[in-house]
Amino acid sequence: SQGSSNLWPSEVIGESSGGFTFSVRVLGNANVTFRDLGTIESSLDSGERFGEATRTYHDGVVQLDQRTTADGVDLPDDGYTSYWSMLNDSQVLPDQSGIAFHNYSTISDGATVDAESGSKPGFDLELSRRFGGFGKRMSDNRRPGSWGGFLGLGLTDINAKTTGTINATLRSITDVYSLDGATPPTAPYTAPSTETVTVIGPDGTETSVVINNSILLANQPISRTVTDEAGAAAIDGFWQVKGTYVSARTGVWSRFHISRQLSIRASAGVSFHLLGVDMRYDERLEDETLAVPIRAQEQGETTSYEAVGLFGSLDVELWLTRRTGLFASFTYEGLSDDLALTLGGRTADVELSSGAGFRFGLTTLF
């Protein structure tokens, strides 16, 4: 009809000089194995065993003594301090002769966890140029087939993450301080401590008086032991590899019109990939008996990688006008690469592959 000839003139779609597509693509995945997990160094300073110093622990602190005379003059060192604190009653030795303080850290037992980043949507642009046509001309003087070259650019995100609990060796540094015969306090306890008492004078007058009832503790350990218990630390963790890869491609294409409104387009070429990824982790050992959680967390800087692969696609195109249409495409990018990221003594083995994917979007000819 006349309306049909206006919509689909004899200058057929396939004889346009070039084209442009904008689409959403779903492509690629990454499998990640995180290795050597679970080493957490203590953030507390327990110092050396000998000598007067402030020593901090996961269940208390022993500070330098700050006792003074009534005139504010420091008392001579008598080997004790009234500035210390404890968190748990279990720190009192069975014979009640002293208090045990602990500084914990963990050592990796080689724990591993796996994470996967499945196919995620990204954006894709392609610019094409027609080089020629093929096939016997039809009654309207058009050729059913055409071919040319293309340049394409795609963007895809990677986000492989997981949470879980791993086991590691628990290292305990135990320092024992003498009470020198004093009665152990009830935990939690902080010295110096005071007590308010009522004093009755000779005339029967009651007066409230604040007295120092601090319990003195030795100002340095009488013993120190270090023990390692394999698998005793249950560590909760979060591990992630995150990034983006940009793929550029070039090659040749061929289009064949089944009808005025329906065509099939195939393309093949090479693809170039630039990948930027970073690794992060957060591992922690928490317990109600610890004043400070044992924790290690870090995020690494973005690391760049380059790779080359193959590209192929098969498109089904539905033309809405002589120059504009919709398309759906099955794609393949033959990219396969193994990467290794290291951070804080931990390693992430990344197996990156593109494989089969899908695109859909808008195409226009000019």
Residue ranges and their predicted role:
Residues 318-327, 337-340:
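Substrate-binding/catalytic groove segments of enzymes
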Residues 55, 78-82, 102, 187, ...:
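Intrinsically disordered, low-complexity segments enriched in small/polar residues
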Residues 35-40, 85-118, 158-245, 274-307, ...:
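Extracellular/periplasm-exposed beta-strand and loop segments of Gram-negative cell-envelope proteins
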Residues 1-83:
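N-terminal, post-signal peptide beta-strand-biased segments of exported outer-membrane/organellar beta-barrel
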Residues 1-39, 95-166, 230-263, 267-269, ...:
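Outer-membrane beta-barrel transmembrane strands
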Residues 69, 201, 321:
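Acidic surface patches and DE-rich sequence motifs
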Residues 44-51, 56-60, 122, 179-181, ...:
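Glycine-centered flexibility motif
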Residues 67, 224, 363-365:
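Surface-exposed charge patches in extracellular/virion surface proteins
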